[in-house]
Amino acid sequence: MTESTPLSQLPWQVTRDEFLRSAAEVTSGGACCVFVIDDAIPKMARSGYAALVIAYARADEPVCILDDGAAALLVRDGGTASGRAVANRVLEQMRKLALDQTIRAGVASLGSDPSASMRAARDAATAGPAGEISVAS
């Protein structure tokens, strides 16, 4: 990856529009997980975090990398309980690499407006402590 390649164009990911379309197809029980990278991590290093989230996601869990390097992951069923389980799986892998204190996870139920759900999950992640999972209320 060159320095000029935007974070939002990593391979093996879905675009924001594809993510939102897929989320809109979930009729009930879905969740959105957002992983926010600490501001202390240089922008150039954030693609590595995004690639790890993609690597730890399952085939049926689309991942969208946002412009600032945050990663949104779609959980199709099981609601916030499944969302927490997915976020925990990713954070456990990050912990093995000693990266868990530089990333935060937020989970929100998938409602009728997937974009709002993504924002709620991101807000929960931003407000939560490093290495932890926060659930939007």
Task: Provide a role label for each language-model segment.
Residues 1, 88-98, 102, 136-137:
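Regulatory sensory/coupling modules that transmit signals to nucleotide-handling catalytic cores
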Residues 31-33, 65-76, 99-124, 134-137:
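A short glycine-enriched loop-to-beta-strand structural element that forms part of the catalytic core
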